Amino acid sequence: MSRIGKQPVSIPSGVECSIKGQLLSVKGKKGQMTLDLHPFTKITSEDGFLKLNPVVEDRDHWAICGTMRALVHNMVVGVTQGFEKKLLLMGVGYRAQAQGQKLTLVLGFSHPVEYAVPQGITIETPTPTEIIVKGFDKQLVGEVAAKIRAYRPPEPYKGKGVRYAGEYVMIKEAKKK
């Protein structure tokens, strides 16, 4: 069984945490996030640490407590450092261009695909075949990267498509006569 829920979350300098009942608010240099904690958990702030405990000492309550602790830790890391995901475009003529809050993708369709970037996310294209998704909300960064990848996921025969940096695509062998 994981013991993540028993570890406290350290609050670095420059981060403000406020607890109002089951609502936790974290504010840092990158932004502000709020989390509605599960009723099975109670949170306390002690000398630079946030400590989560279950309401009842039970296996299920500790499991929820571990999940909540991971979400709180991601909030603290997000408002201090932020998160980023890198995507690569593989294929002849595949390219991307970021213009403000809009991402234009040319992925071999008859038309360019336009993606409206949500609030709190910034997208950079250092090269036409590279996309970097940045933000302070880990869930939102992952969701945006997954939506961009879903436009043209890597196909198994040539590996063409949008893939995460470091993702291994299993290449199948072509059918033999």
From Swiss-Prot:
GO terms for biological process: cytoplasmic translation. InterPro entries: Ribosomal_uL6-like, Ribosomal_uL6-like_a/b-dom_sf, Ribosomal_uL6_a/b-dom, Ribosomal_uL6_bac-type, Ribosomal_uL6_CS. Pfam families: Ribosomal_L6 (PF00347). SUPFAM superfamilies: Ribosomal protein L6. GO terms for molecular function: rRNA binding; structural constituent of ribosome. The keyword Hydrolase does not apply. It comes from the Bacteria. One of its GO terms (cellular component) is cytosolic large ribosomal subunit. Keywords: Ribonucleoprotein, Ribosomal protein, RNA-binding, rRNA-binding. The keyword Secreted does not apply. Part of the 50S ribosomal subunit. This protein binds to the 23S rRNA, and is important in its secondary structure. It is located near the subunit interface in the base of the L7/L12 stalk, and near the tRNA binding site of the peptidyltransferase center. This is Large ribosomal subunit protein uL6. It comes from Dichelobacter nodosus (strain VCS1703A). The gene is rplF.
